[in-house]
Amino acid sequence: GFSSIFRGVAKFASKGLGKDLARLGVNLVACKISKQC
């Protein structure tokens, strides 16, 4: 079903996108600090 597909995608994403998420987090913090959101 959909949930198993989603779980598979989430597993794949957690491996591949960990760095991207970290970068997004850093960008978000920088954005908040500089108040340019």
From Swiss-Prot:
Listed GO CC annotations: extracellular region
Subcellular localization: Secreted
Tissues/organs with expression: Expressed by the skin glands.
Record-level GO BP terms: defense response to Gram-negative bacterium
SS bond partners: C31-C37
Keywords associated with the record: Amphibian defense peptide, Antibiotic, Antimicrobial, Disulfide bond, Secreted
InterPro entries according to UniProt: Antimicrobial_frog_2
Pfam families with a match to the protein in the record: Antimicrobial_2 (PF08023)
Main location class: secreted
Family to which the UniProt record says this protein belongs: Belongs to the frog skin active peptide (FSAP) family. Esculentin subfamily.
Function: Antibacterial activity against Gram-negative bacterium E.coli.
Listed name of the protein: Esculentin-2P
Record organism: Lithobates pipiens (Northern leopard frog)
